[in-house]
UniProtKB/Swiss-Prot annotation:
It holds the Pfam family GTP_EFTU_D2. The lineage of its organism: Eukaryota, Viridiplantae, Chlorophyta, Ulvophyceae, TCBD clade. Its EC number is 3.6.5.3. One of its GO terms (molecular function) is GTP binding. GTP binds at residues 47-50. GTP hydrolase that promotes the GTP-dependent binding of aminoacyl-tRNA to the A-site of ribosomes during protein biosynthesis. It is an enzyme of class 3 (hydrolase). Belongs to the TRAFAC class translation factor GTPase superfamily. Classic translation factor GTPase family. EF-Tu/EF-1A subfamily. GO terms for cellular component: chloroplast; mitochondrion. This is Elongation factor Tu, chloroplastic. PANTHER family: ELONGATION FACTOR TU, CHLOROPLASTIC (PTHR43721:SF5), ELONGATION FACTOR TU-RELATED (PTHR43721).
Length: 235
């Protein structure tokens, strides 16, 4: 469930495969789920390359990964595959946070990975012109401040101080946004594509559930009947 929720929001993904062990059964599951929920682009990182002495073994794992990706209709031969060691890169940077990547091959490979992400995964077009809409994924309370709803802004934009509607499951309510936060940074404005926490005035935690939405007042209407496309996954 959590894998699907996260993957459904992605503009791209890094598939991590052990260079020492090759693709595991769950690797295929993750690729299948990514394809089914519409993750458009994948970059591959072959981890634990430090544990593989024979370069040909890494090449065999790379070929196996390419075949697996192609099996699920990703362009396996075009997808960037970078080998490295996350552990050795982390240890090097922990020991010397100011380390120049050029002086450590494992750190350099992580930078190469991120460059590949920037180059291969296209910058997504955000739907910023339509009315604000965010599906609520989680909710929690901050003592002395109020209730926070978290989720990904699907479309539009929203500012601190703006009035929004809480819609779905229960009676529609209006509330005012008193705070926006993303990755522990306070924002004045949030736009489509942001994963944010929204602090709401006058709303109790019990009034919000996952599956409800925050929206510009009057922009959406809840329905009891709808058509949906469902993927049934089997083992």
């Amino acid at each position: 469930k959590n894998m699907i929720t996260g993957a459904a929001q992605m503009d791209g993904a890094i598939l991590v495969v052990s260079g020492a062990d090759g693709p595991m059964p769950q690797t295929k599951e993750h690729i299948l789920l990514a394809k089914q929920v519409g993750v458009p682009s994948i970059v591959v990182f072959l981890n634990k390359a430090d544990q593989v002495d024979d370069e040909e073994l890494l090449e065999l794992v790379e070929l196996e990964v390419q075949e697996t990706l192609s099996e699920y209709e990703y362009p396996g031969e075009e997808i960037p595959i970078i080998s490295g060691s996350a552990l050795l890169a982390l240890e090097a940077l922990t020991e010397n946070p100011e380390l120049d990547s050029a002086n450590n091959e494992w750190v350099q490979k992580i930078y190469h990975l991120m460059d590949s992400v920037d180059d291969y995964i296209p910058l997504p077009e955000r739907d910023t012109d339509k009315p604000f809409l965010m599906a609520i994924e989680d909710v929690f309370s901050i003592t002395g401040r109020g209730t926070v709803a978290t989720g990904r802004v699907e479309r539009g934009s929203v500012d601190v101080g703006e009035t929004v509607e809480l819609v779905g499951l229960k009676e529609t309510k209006e509330t005012i946004i008193t705070g926006l936060e993303m990755f522990q940074k306070t924002l004045d404005k949030s736009v489509a594509g942001d994963n944010v926490g929204i602090l709401l005035r006058g709303i109790q935690k019990e009034e919000i559930q996952r599956g409800m939405v925050l929206a510009k007042p009057g922009s959406i209407t809840p329905h009891r009947c709808f058509k949906a496309q469902v993927y049934i996954l089997k083992k």
